[in-house]
Amino acid sequence: MAGNSYGTLYKVTTFGESHGEALGGIIDGCPSGIELDFEAIEVEMSRRKPGQSAIVTQRKEPDAVQFLSGIFEGKTTGTPIGFIIPNTNQKSDDYSHIKDNYRPSHADYVYDQKYGFRDYRGGGRSSARETASRVVAGAIAKQMLPEIKINAYVSSVGPIHLDTPYQDLDFSKIESNPVRCPDEKSAAIMEEYIRDIRKQGDTVGGVVSCVIQNVPVGLGEPVFDKLHAELGKAMLSINAVKGFEYGSGFSGSEMKGSEHNDLYNPDGTTKTNLSGGIQGGISNGMDIYFRVAFKPVATIMQTQDSLDNKGNITPMTGKGRHDPCVVPRAVPIVEAMAAIVLADFYLINKTY
C-alpha cells in the first residue's frame, strides 16, 4: 500500500491500524535544535483523542506519544523523528459482524477489491484513528513556526451555521465547549443537535473553518505546487472530508471582477481579502482562511442494506463506538495538516 507519506522536505509518514498494537509515524526533515514543548504536544493530542466528551466516540485512549528517535535532551537532532502511540482500548469483537460484509459508504469494499485482503477491525488503515499520528507531526510543525498562528473551529453542524465573520470571533473561546465553536450560543444549539442525532442512532456532518495569521509573503510554488493546492490536498486527505474552499470560495464565482479584486494599500497589504491570503499560489501576507466540509459518519446505529463478499444484499446494523459528528475532533486535525503544509513550504523557501 503506497500513499502513506506527505511532504517534500518536511516529510511525514504514518503507519498503524485502528485495532493494531500501535499507531506511529516518522518525521523526516525537521531541522535540528528545536526545543520541543512536550506538554504542548500532549495538549494537541488531548484535543483529538476519543472519549473526551459525551458527543464523541466513547472509545477511551490515552494517546500517549512515545518518541523513539530524533530527539536528544529535549531538542530535535535533525535526524528522523520516530514515534508510536499505543492502542490500549480496542474492542475488535464489535466488528466481527462485518468480517464478510461491506458497510455502506465505508472503504471496506474498495480495500477488498484493490488489495484482496483487509483488516476489518475498526476500519484498519482507513480508520480516522490514523490521524493521531498527523497531530503529532502537526504539533511539532507548529513549534517550528511559532510566529504563525493557526486557529480552526467548528462553523457548522448539519443545518446549524455560525455566520459571524472570523474577524469578529474570540478564538480563545474555541476550547470552552465540546463542539469547539467560538460562539457560545451557536455551540449550545450545535451540541444539543448532535445529542439528538445520536439518540436517533444517526450521524451528522459539518464544516471546520481555519484561519492562519502572520504568514510571511512567499510561501508556495507556482503552477503545480500552489499553496492553496497543497492545503486542499492535505485537507482532502483527512477522513470524511468532502469539500475544501478558500478565500471567497464558490461564492466568488457569483461576483464581478470589480467586486472581487483585493485593492492594495501602500504597504502591500490589501483593503479586502477575498483572495484568502493567497495569490498566484503564493502567500501574500494576509490572513489565510479556508473551510473544510465533513460528511456524516458512515456507521449509524440503524439497520441498512449491506453487501457481503458473496454478492448478497444483507441487512446490517452498526455496532461499536463511533462519533455521531466528527467535526469537534477534526478541529486539531485540520490545524495539524495546515501546519505540516506550511512547515514544508517554509523549508522549501529556504532553498532559494
UniProtKB/Swiss-Prot annotation:
GO biological process: amino acid biosynthetic process; aromatic amino acid family biosynthetic process; chorismate biosynthetic process
Gene3D superfamilies: Chorismate synthase AroC
Reaction catalysed by this enzyme: 5-O-(1-carboxyvinyl)-3-phosphoshikimate = chorismate + phosphate
GO molecular function: chorismate synthase activity; FMN binding
One Pfam assignment: Chorismate_synt
Annotated cofactor note: Reduced FMN (FMNH(2)).
Residue numbers binding FMN: 125-127, 239-240, 280, 295-299, 321
Superkingdom of the source species: Bacteria
Gene Ontology annotations for the cellular component aspect, listed alphabetically: cytosol
Record EC number: 4.2.3.5
Pathway membership: Metabolic intermediate biosynthesis; chorismate biosynthesis; chorismate from D-erythrose 4-phosphate and phosphoenolpyruvate: step 7/7
Cofactor: FMNH2
Alphabetized UniProt keyword annotations: Amino-acid biosynthesis, Aromatic amino acid biosynthesis, FAD, Flavoprotein, FMN, Lyase, NADP
Binding residues for NADP(+): 48
Homology family: Belongs to the chorismate synthase family.
NCBIfam families with a match to the protein in the record: aroC, PRK05382.1
Physiological role: This reaction introduces a second double bond into the aromatic ring system.
PANTHER family: CHORISMATE SYNTHASE
Subunit text: Homotetramer.
UniProt-recorded name of the protein: Chorismate synthase
Species of origin: Flavobacterium johnsoniae (strain ATCC 17061 / DSM 2064 / JCM 8514 / BCRC 14874 / CCUG 350202 / NBRC 14942 / NCIMB 11054 / UW101) (Cytophaga johnsonae)
Gene giving rise to this polypeptide: aroC
